[in-house]
Structures are given as C-alpha cells and as structure tokens.
C-alpha cells in the first residue's frame, strides 16, 4: 500500500439506526501506534473515480435472491483445482489450497434460496456459531515470558575484575627482593556469574585473594632464608680456594727452584689424570672380548718347567687355545690375576674395567676400556700371546717364541684407552688440560741389541725427565744406550724399582686427544733369546716430579632466584535479562489473531537492562535489539521506528501502561541515541557509543523499540522473535504469531454451452476459432470469523481484444451463503444486481460491489463464514494464437493479481492433396492415359488438435472425418488400397469407418471414436492414400479435391487435375505395306493377299503416366481371311532405347514386339524394352505411337468386316471397323483334289539384321504360331519382298 505520510487513513462502517456511515480512523505517528485514537466519528462517503461509466449486466435480476439461468448443474460444488487455474509467480498470487470447500459454489451451481443444496447446509453446520449479540472483536492471546533457558540464547556476559588489596600489598613487598621476579598470570576466570549472585561471589573472591597473599609472603621468606645460607657457604668456599691457590703457587715456585735437577722436567707438569694403583685398587674386569683365548690349565700342564710369566707366554700356543674366556683366567704365582689371550695381527682385543675411582680434573672416571691391536709380531701366523692383568695399572704382558738363532725380531701393539664417567659418557681431555700418563720401565741394552719403546702421535707431547736415558727419537720414545747390563755404567739394578732412580728408564707423555699410542720391543741383534716378550704398564704413576694441579675446592653458588606468580580474579557477569515482544494493532494485543493484507501492526520489543546496573558501565560496549521479520509477509518503514527509555518498574506486557508512559512523556524518546539499520529482513537498533566504546545511555532501564509493519499479500502464519544484544551475548524474547488466511483471487476459462457455463477448465487447452467461451473471474476468500471491514471489493479484467471479443454478456454469483437484508442468498445465487461494471472500450472491464452489498458484507452474520464471489463474462475467439488472461482484485485498495489462464487457438487446418503416378512422382497437371493409376495423396492436418484440445467447446457428434470427391466418370477407385497412416508411417486404417458412394464418386473416412482419435493422433499430419485407375475410352480433364472435417469445421484441400487426351487408334486396309491407298470399302479378289493396317493411339507429349502394357488383338474372320504369318511394326516417332540406341521415325521395330496367333486372333504385344523406352524421361517431350501390319489372304467371297482391339495398360478399346467385298468366282469344273500335308515347322524368316552401336536388343525375330504349333513366317521378310529395306534401323554415326 502506498504510504504518503505517517497518517494511514482507513474507513470503518458503523450502523447508525438503519443507515451505514463511514468514519475515518486515524493512526498518527508512533504515539498512535500504541493507542492514540480520535474520538470524533464523522460520516463519510467512499471515494469514487470521476468519469466512471457503470452498467448493469445483460440479465439484471429484479429479485434479490433469484438464481441465474447461466450456470450448468453439476453433481457437487468444487473449488477450482490446479488443473484449471495455474498459479502465477509467487509475488503475484499464492497457489490455491487443495481440496474442496464445501460451502463454496462454482458456476455450475444452480442453488436458489428456496432450494438450498446439501453443500450449503453442511457449510452452515460447520461454520462456527457467533451470537448475534456478541459485538466484541477477537482478543489476542496473552504473550508468554521469554524463558531464561533458551537454546537460541548466546550467553550475555559483562567482564568483571575483582579487587585484590591483600595480594597487591604482598606483591609490592616481594618486588623489593632483587632475587624475586614477580609475574602476574592471567586473571583466574571464575566463569559466568549471575548478576543476582554477584555479591556472594565477591565475598568468595576476597577470601581467595587473602589466601594467595599469604602464600606470596611465605614464598618470599623461604627464598630469603635460602640465599642467606648460600652466602655463608660461598664465603667458606672462597677461603678454601684462596688457600688452594696459595698452595699451588707455592708448589710451582718450589718446583722452579729444582727444575734443572734430575727427576724433574723442564716445565712443570700438572697431573690432571689420576689413574694409579690407589685409584684402581677396587677395579673389576667387566668383560674381555677376544677371538681366541689360551687354556690356562693346558698351558701350565705343558710348560711346567717355565716359572716366569714371560717364559710361559714365549711359547707356541698351538693346541692350547680355547673359546671359553673363563678357562683362560689365570693367577700367576705372585698372586696377580689376568686373562690369557691370543692376539692376532690387526684384530682388536678389548678389556673393560669397572668400579674405578680414577679422575680427570676431579671428575670421576668410573670405567675404562683398553683395546689392543697387534701391528707387528715375529710369529709367522701373526700371533702374540698375552696376559691381560685384572689390575688395569699392571696392564699387559705379551710374549712369543722365537728361534734363538734369529738375529732380528720385534713386536708392536697399538693401545687405545677410553675413559667413561658415571653417566656412561666418554671423558675426553681439553687442549689446556691434556691427559698426562707415564711411559716407564722402558728397558734397553742399546739400540743395536734390543730395546723397548713407545710410539706417539704428532699431537702427543713427550716430556723428557732430567737425568733419564729415554728420549724421543722421531715418533719412538726409548733409550739408545744400555741401561740394563752396565756396559755404559748403568745396570737395571740401578733404577728398576729403585726409589728416586726410576726416572732413568722413564718419560712423561701428554695428549689433548683420546689416548692412543703403540708400544713394543725391538731385537736388533739377538743375544740368544728364545722368546720375544715385554711387560707394559699403563698408569699415571709418573717417574718425574710433578705438580698437583690447582683444583677449586668448590665454586661459589649464585643466589637462588625465584619467580612468584600471582593472579587476580575475573568473572563474566551474566545479567538476568528478560526482553519481551508484543504485537499490537495500535490499541490492543493481537497476538495469535488473523490479519489480512494491508493491515498495520506494530511490534514492541523491550530491551531489559535492569541487572546491567550492577556492572561497570564502561564494560557495556554493545546494547541493542535485533528483530528479524518475515519479509515475505510484512514490510517496514524504518523512518517510523522509535525507541523509548522507560523506568525499570514498567510492566511491558500491559500495553495500556506502555501507551500511558509514552503519551505522558514518562518514557523518553531516545531514538536519537540509537543507530537504526535495515538489512533485508532484519532491523537492528543499537545504542550509540562513547569514545571509550561504552554505550551512551545508562543501564538499569527498559528500552522500548516500536516497529511499524504492514501485512503483505502472502498467506500463512508468520512468527516473530527478537533478540536483545548485550556485548557479545544474545537473549531471545518470547515469540508472537499472526495468521494471514489465503486471499488469492483466481482466474479460469470455461466452455460456453449455448449460454451455459461449462464444467471443465479450458486452461492451457486448444480452442477453435469463432468459439464462444466464458472467463471465470473469481475473488479471493474473505476468511471466516473476520474481524476487519470490507471497504472496497472489485475485480478488473483486461481482455486481449486482438484475440477475444467481449459479447457484452456477463453475470455474477455469490460463492457462499450471503444474507442481504432479510433474505439469504444461497451459494451460486446471481448477485449481478449488486455489481457495477465499468466498461472501457469492451477491453478494460472492472466489476465492483455497490454500497448495499458492502454494507451487507459488514454485517456480523456475514462475518461468521467465508465470503467470495465470481463473475462470468462471455467472449468470442476471433483470432488464432496463444491468449493469456489475468484478473486483478482490489480489496480495500490492495491490488492482487490472480493466476494467469492460457488458451491456444491454432491456425485453421491446412490439408493438402497431390496426385502421383506409380513411381510416386507428382503428376499434377500432367497428361495421363487410360489404365494409368492416379494415386491421390492427401495430408490430414491435425497439428492444431492434440491432447490439449478443448473437447468441451465442440459437438463431439459432428465427428472427425476426411472426404474425397473423385471423378467417377473418368477414374475407378482401387478401394482395397485406400490407406490412412500416421506421422510415423504406421497403418491406422482400421480406426476408421470408410463409406463409398459410387454413384456420386465420394468416399468418407470417419474416426470411429473421435475424441480417442484426437488424443491418439492429434498434433500430427496423417497421410491418406486413394489410388484410382483411369477408365478406358475417356478423355478430358479429371479433377480431384478432398475436405477435412474436425468437429464441424470443414476445410477443403487444394484441387489437382490431370488431362486425358482423346483416344485415337485407327484401322485400315492396304494391299502393300506402305501403300497410301486405302482399300476400306473396296473389293478384294478371291485369293488376293493384302494387309490390315493398325495405327495405335498416341502417347501424348509430356505424358505423366507409366506405360505398363501395350498390345493389339485382331480377331480375323477366318472363314474369309487366312493369316499369312506376315506382320511388322514401324515407329511413328523418334525415340531412344534404355541402352542409348536411337530409333528413328519409320524404323522397323518388330523386334521390340512379339506376336502370337491363337484361335484366329493375331496379338501383337510391346516388349518390356519398348515399354521402358516409352517411360524414359528423354522420350517424354514428344508424342509416340506405332503402326502394325498383319498379312492375310482372302479365301472366301463375301463382305468381310474387321476391327482391332487396342489394350493400353490393360484398358481395351476398339478401333474403327473396316470392310472389304469379295465377289464369288465363276463356276468352273472342279479340279482334282490334292491333299496338302501339314506345313512343317519352319524357322522364322529373319528380319534384316539391325546394325546398332550397342548390342542390347536381341536380334531374334518375333515368334508366331497357333496352339496346334503351326508356325507362320515372319513378316520381317516382307520388307525385303516389298523393297522396304530402307525402313530398317538407321545406324548411328560415331564421331571418332
């Protein structure tokens, strides 16, 4: 509805005594929305348009309540279904309800007031009964309170930070300690707290923060005590380290005083590695891994004479080995234990020691691994026998037997030492503090005899001892001079195991890497040894003066640090919000009531902020209302939306109280403090915000959002639920609902059965031209228990005057029982007297209820049940095409379009006719001859008649048929070959009754079941074939046309014509072939020979037929004429044969014919080759005929008559009759009778051979003869006899 201002004008009728007055009701602005109405009621007339012409129907009924005779009677009243009225677009009209309303009348009802129908009685019983005294309008259902627990709610929460004074104080104290880092954790989230439980939660938080403050103070005190203890221990460590440093410095100074003395090295050596007897005294062998062991028992048993370990090892161990390491363990007589193994060249043997107490720079060495690999041995098998000491610092003794005569021998073993800490990780030295170990007891008798050595790597350092004979020579460390037997003044007794002298045969080695070196002995000039052996000990028992390295007695500890964490407390305060929704018509609650299109209603949504007063107002950053409405049902004008601030005590469900608060100003208009937004079907009203994002209005109030809506023309229920928006939460209101009953006008089209409205819908049907039909213009239904006022009700129909002509006839009926004054008009009663027609050019037709009928409709008794009405207007279809028609209903100035009905009027049928020859060629206007078949081919046009044909508009008795009028004087129908076929070529002839009228030359083909026939074959072109045959001896033009009848509509086909030339065969008598002198009527001597001459009929030029047969039959008068056996045929025109052979006029063409003579009848028949030639296209441009000669001998006197019968396409005609006269001979004595034997069979006389370019013509002569096998000579020889050779075929000339 068009809204011009905020004032919506509506009219309501009131009955004052016996008259109806119309009073305007004004709803002014938003205040009017909530209940401000005028008290002044004035009479007013309904507006009428100037210049309107109103007319009464063609059959005004002077008696109110009488029925119209214009509707047909049906068994029951039904509501138009989908098949009769197709709904249009949704925005125009909703689909109609299925099923029938029993109180509704269709145009087929003829119910009058005196004879109510069963349907009307039933309708009255089913409609609710309302007391006539009841004047109250329906009351809306009270709305419910929105449930607090709603799945649609999103928790509305306001952040709340609680105060923690005790925690703050404890934190400040803790921050004074530099060793304490105070970290504030995220505030502990106490979850959601109802605004009603907030006070209790604050007490709970106060207790929590006090307990936390106590814990913080305790943590700070404990850390302080720990750090005071650390400070005391650090002072003690500092004192010890100072004393250690003083010791070290003093020891270094003392060392330096003696560094040039024997037993000292030039530079003080720090003994970083402790791996001596004391450190290994509790060691245990963990494992020995060798490929081969020496069985100790076998060894001692075999070599009992050897007492020394070196001697025992310097033997051949063959046969003494074992794989069992336990059998190899052996205790030497001095009590030293170990494992006997066989070392093989380049095959490592490993022994692992555990339970050590060694150390490196104070770090404990818990285990050690010694790996031995033989690099050189005098044994040819690469063996060395060895004894691996259980004591790691005693290490190894090896030996092998040698031939005493051997001058040179030597052995060399690589040793790899790995140390492991208590954690199992390998301990390695640093460059600053390398491993330092002893290289002692290196015996030597001089480098020219024998010596023991140690080989070192490039990164190893050899620290030579003052006074020692052992020095580094290349990568070997040994003594070059004799220190064993005294040849140089030093014997082994001077230093081996002599306290203070052991340095003579020793050195000190250091390495920054894992310990890896080689040891062994070298015999340069064997003094007579039978074994090669050596004892090597690895340890840190240095044979030189060393300095105990400086070792810290402890490192000062750093004061302990502590991180004290604390947290504050927060919660999400969930305010108890109870938003509310009401729907009103401006004065009262209309929840759950019916409304109709165009009605105004308002939603009042209350946003409850009462509980939000308990939180910090700055934490409320979003506050508003969102209303999502059903945009299909209602529209809104955003400019009229208002928001009011009301006191928290207002009962928003009391609409009177709400109106009073607004009208008095107690509820303030705060619309300016809101941002209003409309997005499609959602209205959002949000409070504006301050610079700090808090809302501008105070909490603790109720905010009323007033939303004005107008109902659309869409039926159905529509609910509305709003949402209060608070920060990130949503709280759903209660739901209100209204109902819009179906109110859709409809349109249909019905047949006009001689002024009576048909019962079947013609929507989407095919309607013939010049057919009269009714448009059914049906109003929407006004609902039962209607509470509104019908101010205006009309229907407009704009005709398509290009296709439809309004005849001026119309009538209207009520579709439900209607009381007018003291009379009750039953459903179906004519109410045309109450309807005004505005007719503009017979095209724009508007039917409107007059004031009397409107007044009656607004009576309370007529509001109990439904109301509706229909108009039927008659039109004539005057042009083919598709025709659409839609009506527009005006109900209280709200315009609604109905569905659109469509009818189709196809073009008139266009049946056609053609005439074909046997080849199927179109020969219309062609020349034909007797015996030709004229096949009349017709199209039966049913394209405009299919399953959508409106059978209700025609008289089925007129049927569907096809009529053909053939020329019975010139053609004969071949009845058995008449066929009707559908568009697919299927024969459907049996579906018709075929009636022949031979006297009139007609045939009628009638569908046995016209309706079923149209349903089955409508929309097609059928093919009708009627073959006929041209009669004999007829000439002139033969015409043919047909007529199609479709339910009384008769349409003729085009006319076809063929031309039949006059038949002209001729008979004559000549003495010789080629004579010009006719002997017809002349005298023929007895015994004289002559010829009967025959000239055939002409095949006309441009002949359209097919030559299928051509012959002549000459029945001789055998009493007078004797067939001589001579015959010939000559061409009367030039033509070509199928193989291209040219035949000229006058050529003898006998070979293209055959002759038979039976029972006195000479028959000459054209061959197929001649017939084919006659049918060639290239021979059609000229007329063709031929001439035949039959030779006879006159054998008796008398008048002799002769007629030849010509057969063309098996149609026979006779020529003219010729006559000759033969007188009797004079009487002479009889001659002696001579018996003549039967004529023997003689070959046919050959015709002069034809010389042709193509030898496709068989050169055999025609056969003659009778059934008695009497052979006659061929007349071909006659040509030579008569000198007619010049009549033979001409040879074609070829151009080479």
From Swiss-Prot:
It is a peptidoglycan-anchor. GO terms for cellular component: extracellular region. Residues 89-99, 160-178 have a biased composition (Basic and acidic residues). The modification Pentaglycyl murein peptidoglycan amidated threonine is found at residue 1264. Gene3D superfamilies: 2.60.40.740, Major cell-surface adhesin PAc. Residues 48-188, 1221-1245 are annotated as: Disordered. PROSITE patterns: GRAM_POS_ANCHORING. Keywords: Cell wall, Peptidoglycan-anchor, Plasmid, Secreted, Signal. Its main location: secreted. The keyword NAD does not apply. Residues 100-117, 125-138 have a biased composition (Polar residues). Residues 1-43 form the signal peptide. It is found in: Secreted, Cell wall. A motif (LPXTG sorting signal) lies at residues 1261-1265. Residues 1265-1296 form a propeptide. Pfam families: Adhesin_P1_N, AgI_II_C2, Antigen_C, GbpC, Gram_pos_anchor, KxYKxGKxW_sig. Belongs to the antigen I/II family. Aggregation substance allows donor and recipient strains to form tight aggregates which allow the non-motile bacteria to maintain physical contact over a period of time sufficient to permit conjugative transfer of the sex pheromone plasmid from donor to recipient strains. This is Aggregation substance. The lineage of its organism: Bacteria, Bacillati, Bacillota, Bacilli, Lactobacillales. The gene is asa1.
């Amino acid at each position: 509805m068009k809204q011009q201002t905020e004032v919506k004008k509506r009219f309501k009728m009131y009955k004052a005594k016996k008259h109806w007055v119309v009073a305007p009701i004004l709803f002014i602005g938003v205040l009017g929305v909530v209940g401000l109405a005028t008290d002044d009621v004035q009479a007013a007339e309904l507006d009428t348009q100037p210049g309107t012409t109103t007319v009464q129907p063609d059959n005004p009924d002077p008696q109110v309540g009488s029925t119209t005779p214009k509707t047909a009677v049906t068994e029951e009243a039904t509501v138009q279904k989908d098949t009769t009225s197709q709904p249009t677009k949704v925005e125009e009209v909703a689909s109609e309800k299925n099923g029938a309303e029993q109180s509704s009348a269709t145009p087929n009802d003829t119910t009058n007031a005196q004879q109510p129908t069963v349907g009307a009685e039933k309708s009255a019983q089913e409609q609710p009964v309302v007391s006539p005294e009841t004047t109250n309008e329906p009351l809306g259902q009270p709305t419910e309170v929105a449930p607090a627990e709603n799945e649609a709610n999103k928790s509305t929460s306001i952040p709340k930070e609680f105060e923690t004074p005790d925690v703050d104080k404890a934190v400040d104290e803790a921050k004074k300690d530099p060793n304490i880092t105070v970290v504030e954790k995220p505030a502990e989230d106490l979850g959601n707290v109802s605004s009603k439980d907030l006070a209790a939660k604050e007490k709970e938080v106060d207790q929590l923060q006090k307990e936390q403050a106590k814990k913080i103070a305790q943590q700070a005190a404990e850390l302080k005590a720990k750090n005071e203890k650390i400070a005391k221990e650090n002072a003690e460590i500092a004192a010890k380290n100072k004393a250690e440093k003083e010791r070290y410095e003093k020891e270094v100074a003392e060392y330096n005083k003696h560094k040039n003395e024997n037993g000292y090295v030039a530079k003080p050596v720090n003994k970083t590695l402790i791996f001596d007897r004391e450190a290994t005294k509790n060691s245990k062998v963990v494992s020995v891994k060798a490929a081969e062991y020496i069985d100790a028992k076998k060894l001692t048993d075999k070599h009992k004479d050897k007492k020394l370990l070196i001697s025992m090892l310097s033997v051949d161990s063959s046969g003494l080995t074992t794989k069992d390491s336990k059998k190899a363990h052996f205790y030497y007589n001095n009590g030293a234990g170990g494992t006997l193994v066989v070392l093989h060249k380049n095959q490592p043997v490993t022994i692992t020691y555990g339970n050590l107490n060694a150390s490196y720079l104070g770090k404990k060495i818990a285990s050690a691994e010694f790996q031995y690999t033989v690099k050189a041995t005098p044994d040819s098998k690469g063996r060395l026998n060895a004894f691996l000491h259980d004591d790691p610092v005693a290490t190894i003794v090896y030996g092998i037997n040698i031939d005493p005569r051997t001058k040179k021998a030597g052995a060399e073993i690589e040793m790899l030492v790995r140390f492991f800490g208590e954690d199992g990780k390998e301990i390695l030295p640093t460059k600053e503090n390398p491993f330092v170990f002893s290289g002692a007891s290196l015996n030597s008798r001089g480098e020219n005899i024998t010596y023991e050595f140690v080989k070192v790597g490039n990164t190893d350092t050899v620290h030579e001892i003052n006074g020692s004979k052992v020095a580094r020579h290349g990568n070997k460390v040994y003594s070059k001079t004799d220190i064993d037997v005294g040849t140089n003044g030093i014997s082994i007794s001077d230093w081996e195991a002599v306290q203070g002298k052991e340095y003579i045969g020793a050195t000190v080695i250091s390495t920054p890497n894992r310990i890896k070196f080689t040891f062994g002995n070298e015999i340069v000039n064997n003094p007579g040894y039978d074994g090669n052996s050596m004892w090597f000990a690895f340890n840190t028992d240095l044979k030189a003066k060393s300095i105990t390295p400086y070792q810290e007695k402890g490192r000062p500890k750093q004061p302990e640090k502590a991180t004290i964490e604390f947290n504050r407390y927060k919660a999400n305060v969930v305010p108890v919000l109870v938003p509310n929704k009401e729907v009103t018509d401006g004065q009262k609650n209309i929840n759950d009531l019916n409304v109709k299109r165009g009605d105004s209603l308002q939603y009042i949504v209350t946003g409850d902020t009462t509980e939000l007063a308990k939180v910090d107002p700055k934490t409320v950053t979003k506050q508003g209302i969102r209303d999502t409405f059903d945009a299909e049902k209602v529209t809104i004008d955003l400019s009229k939306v208002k928001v009011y601030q009301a006191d928290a005590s207002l009962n928003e469900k009391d609409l009177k109280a709400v109106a009073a608060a607004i009208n008095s100003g107690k509820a303030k208009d705060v619309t300016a403090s809101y941002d209003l937004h409309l997005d499609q079907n959602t209205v959002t009203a949000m409070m504006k915000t301050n610079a700090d994002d808090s809302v501008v209005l105070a909490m603790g109030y109720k905010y009323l959002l007033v939303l004005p809506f107008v109902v659309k023309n869409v039926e159905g229920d529509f609910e509305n639920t709003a949402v209060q928006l608070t920060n990130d939460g949503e709280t759903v209101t209660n739901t209100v609902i209204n109902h819009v009953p179906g109110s859709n006008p409809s349109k249909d089209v019905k047949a006009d059965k001689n002024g009576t409205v048909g019962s079947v819908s013609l929507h989407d049907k095919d309607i013939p031209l010049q057919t009269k039909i009714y448009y059914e213009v049906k109003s929407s239904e006004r609902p039962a228990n209607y509470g509104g006022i019908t101010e205006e009700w009309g229907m407009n129909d704009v005709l398509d005057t290009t296709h439809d002509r309004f005849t001026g006839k119309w009538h209207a009926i009520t579709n439900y029982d209607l009381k007018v004054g003291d009379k009750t008009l039953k459903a179906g009663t004519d109410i045309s007297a109450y309807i005004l027609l505005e007719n503009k050019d017979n095209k724009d037709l508007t039917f409107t209820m007059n004031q009397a009928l409107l007044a009656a409709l607004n009576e309370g008794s007529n509001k109990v049940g439904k109301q509706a009405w229909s108009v039927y207007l008659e039109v004539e279809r005057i042009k083919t095409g598709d025709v659409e028609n839609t009506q527009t209903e005006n109900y209280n100035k709200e315009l609604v379009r109905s569905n659109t009905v469509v009818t189709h009027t196809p073009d008139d049928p266009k049946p056609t006719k053609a005439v074909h020859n046997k080849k199927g060629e179109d020969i219309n206007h062609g020349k034909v001859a007797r015996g030709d078949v004229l096949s009349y081919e017709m199209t039966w046009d049913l394209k405009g008649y299919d399953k959508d044909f409106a059978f209700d508009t025609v008289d089925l008795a007129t049927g569907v048929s096809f009529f053909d009028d053939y020329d019975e004087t010139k053609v004969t129908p071949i009845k058995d070959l008449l066929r009707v076929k559908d568009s697919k070529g299927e024969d459907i002839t049996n579906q018709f009754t075929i009636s022949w009228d031979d006297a009139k030359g007609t045939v009628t083909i009638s569908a046995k079941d016209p309706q079923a026939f149209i349903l089955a074959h409508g929309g097609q072109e059928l093919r009708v074939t009627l073959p006929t045959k041209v009669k004999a001896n007829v000439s002139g033009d033969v015409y043919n046309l047909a007529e199609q009848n479709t339910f009384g509509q008769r349409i003729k086909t085009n006319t076809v014509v063929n031309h039949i030339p006059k038949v002209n065969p001729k008979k004559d008598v000549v003495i010789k072939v080629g004579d010009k002198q006719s002997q017809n009527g002349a005298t023929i001597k007895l015994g004289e020979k002559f010829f009967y001459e025959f000239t055939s009929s002409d095949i006309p030029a441009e002949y359209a037929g097919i030559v299928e047969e051509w012959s002549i039959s000459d029945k001789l008068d055998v009493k007078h004429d004797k067939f001589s056996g001579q015959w010939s045929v000559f061409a009367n025109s030039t033509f070509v044969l199928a193989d291209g052979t040219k035949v000229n006029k006058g050529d003898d063409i006998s070979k293209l014919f055959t002759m038979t003579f039976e029972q006195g009848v000479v028959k000459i028949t054209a061959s197929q080759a001649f017939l084919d030639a006659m049918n060639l296209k290239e021979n059609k441009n000229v007329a063709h005929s031929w001439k035949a000669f039959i030779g006879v001998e006159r054998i008796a006197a008398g008048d002799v008559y002769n007629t030849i019968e010509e057969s063309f396409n098996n149609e026979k005609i006779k020529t003219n009759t010729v006559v000759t006269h033969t007188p009797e001979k004079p009487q002479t004595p009889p001659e002696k009778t001579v018996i003549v034997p039967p004529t023997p069979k003689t070959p046919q006389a050959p015709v002069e051979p034809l010389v042709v370019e193509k030898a496709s013509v068989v050169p055999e002569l025609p056969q003659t003869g009778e059934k008695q096998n009497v052979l006659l000579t061929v007349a071909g020889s006659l040509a030579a006899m008569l000198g007619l050779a010049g009549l033979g075929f001409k040879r074609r000339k070829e151009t080479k």
